[in-house]
């Protein structure tokens, strides 16, 4: 084995020597070249990283600038929209001004409606009040009529109507009845002139009835006296 190893080593050395002779380059030089290559590649790698970082920074800066540019048109659009809304709001505000006269014109009509409603409301209570007053006046009139119908004046008027046939036969009795009836009529007129009340009417009716009852005997006595005076007058004429 050792013999084989030695032989192979010698062969390899011989091969290396032959290559060196052919190339004319020593192994040290090859190593130096390889080191320089490695260093160069490493430097290149570093520079590439730097370039990439710079590029990234440049890319980021470019992206930021692009974003700013994009944001600027958006802001302009927003401002334009805000201006559009302000103009739209100003337009309705200006449009509402001509409507204000219409509203002002509507307010008098509304006031008129309110006055009309108030007038109707006032007329509604007045109408029942007037109807109540009419009913009260009708009741008072009916009461006065009933009192006048039941008053002694009517009875006094009926009494002279009944006595008219007797007075036609006795002229002297007519004068006596004429003298007595005005007093009864005056009493009846006074009784009717007074305001009718429930208690007053009853008392006055009783007084008038008593007065009529008192006047009837007087009238009959005067009629008898008139009858007695008639023959005496006839005798005197004869």
From Swiss-Prot:
It comes from the Eukaryota. Keywords: Calmodulin-binding, Cell membrane, Cell projection, Cytoplasm, Developmental protein, Differentiation, Growth regulation, Lipoprotein, Membrane, Neurogenesis, Palmitate, Phosphoprotein, Synapse. A lipid is attached at residues 3-4 (S-palmitoyl cysteine). PROSITE patterns: IQ, NEUROMODULIN_1, NEUROMODULIN_2. Residues 84-95, 119-130, 168-199 have a biased composition (Low complexity). Residues 139-154 have a biased composition (Polar residues). The modification Phosphothreonine is found at residue 181. It is found in: Cell membrane; Cell projection, Growth cone membrane; Synapse; Cell projection, Filopodium membrane. SMART domains: IQ. It is a peripheral membrane protein. This protein is associated with nerve growth. It is a major component of the motile 'growth cones' that form the tips of elongating axons. Plays a role in axonal and dendritic filopodia induction. This is Neuromodulin. It comes from Homo sapiens (Human).
